[in-house]
A protein has these predicted regions:
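Conserved SAM/SAH cofactor-binding pocket of Class I
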Residues: 1-47
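Residue-level signal for inorganic ion chemistry
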Residues: 2, 36, 52, 74, ...
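Helix-to-beta-strand junctions that scaffold the AdoMet/dcAdoMet cofactor pocket
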Residues: 11, 56, 81-84
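Alpha/beta-hydrolase-fold catalytic nucleophile elbow
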Residues: 36, 55, 91
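Mobile active-site "lid"/loop adjacent to the S-adenosyl-L-methionine
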Residues: 39-69
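Conserved Class I SAM-dependent methyltransferase catalytic core
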Residues: 65-129
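Flexible, glycine-/basic-rich loop-and-beta segments that form/coincide
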Residues: 128-137
Length: 137
């Protein structure tokens, strides 16, 4: 877990970890938000392996029609939670990098790095909030 990793890295004393429902997350001023929202398009759920479907609840998988519903929500909500120059680390699904990056930019973020999986697909975007913008639906 993130807490265990922070203890191993001797960062626990200066870190706070919260696992919350995005809708109940209060406005605050955070330095970093890490999110792994559901990002699988609804139409693709039926094609997932049984190992995934039997292990994960549907709410942890289904990202809506294009898989971006909760990604958009995290970006919008984090815009009100992060300090200026705060960082957002956001996991994205296969082939969602460009669309997620566009939404981030529109909402006042600048991407500073991307992390790829073993197949060289971008799976995580790390960005910095540089200004406040309205949410693009």
């Amino acid at each position: 877990t993130a807490e265990a990793n922070s203890k191993n890295l001797k960062l626990f004393y200066r870190s706070k970890f919260k696992v919350v429902d995005l809708d109940k997350f209060n406005i605050g001023k955070y330095d970093l938000i890490v999110s792994n929202p559901p990002y699988i398009p609804s139409r693709d759920i039926k094609n997932l392996s049984k190992d995934i479907i039997n292990y994960e609840p549907l709410t942890a998988l289904d990202g809506g029609v294009d898989g971006l519903d909760l990604i958009k929500k995290v970006i919008y909500k984090s815009n009100h939670l992060l300090k200026r120059m705060g960082m957002l680390a956001l996991e994205v699904g296969h082939n969602q990098y460009r669309r997620a990056l566009s939404i981030l930019r529109y909402n006042g973020y600048r991407a500073i790095s991307k992390e790829c999986d073993y197949n060289r697909n971008v799976r995580c975007i790390i960005s910095t909030k540089v200004s406040f913008f309205k949410f693009k639906k």
